[in-house]
Amino acid sequence: MNDLLEVRNVSVSFDGFKAINSLSWSIGYPELRAIIGPNGAGKTTLMDIITGKTKADSGKVLWDEVAIPLTQKSEYQIAKLGIGRKFQRPTIFEEQSVEENIIISLKNNRGFFATLTYKYTDQEKIRVGEIASTIKLTSLLSKKAGELSHGQKQWLEIGMLLSQDPKLLLIDEPAAGMTTKERNMTVQLLRDLSKTKSIIVVEHDMDFIRNLGCRVTVLHEGSVLAEGSIDHVSKNKEVVEVYLGR
């Protein structure tokens, strides 16, 4: 498995506080990876650096086989390269239907209002149907997004990211606020997607991560503390001390 993204000796400080400290880390393609760590460990800052929201003070972030330096790119340019990010709170158009939300997000150069009046092609219709099927919302295409359950809104936003054909998805705390059934369905969705994409999941819910069955990276004080299966890192004495609190 080749690396899709490599973070090489990256550091960043805020007002003297080193949020990321000489961090080196990578994810393969395709791969599902969970990132855990206590508050202030650097999880969000790492995601911000990958997506260009925060610029590193030093080090490199390299993308794909040709090692494109992401630290020299804008957020927009990074997104266009194939990196999509979903925050904890869903960002959807609640007054539009599920179908319209997906259409709006399709990879094209049309604006919001132009998209709503645009008569999309048969190929685009097929793509919308495929995405709806993937996120288990086919029967709800005509429903207003604001009327969906919390879990369904999360899936819709993932579908909106999928419409951009990303190679890497960054998913922030997907399990928060979900019912048990929704959490189980989300686990299956992420596992299915990881067969053809790389996915980074930042999550606090250990049961959710265990069900993902993927490699886990533990961050602490801006560096990698441990990596391996959830069972492996849970037995690491340093991890127990700084994260699990046992």
Residue ranges and their predicted role:
Residues 51:
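Helix-to-loop junction immediately C-terminal to a conserved catalytic motif
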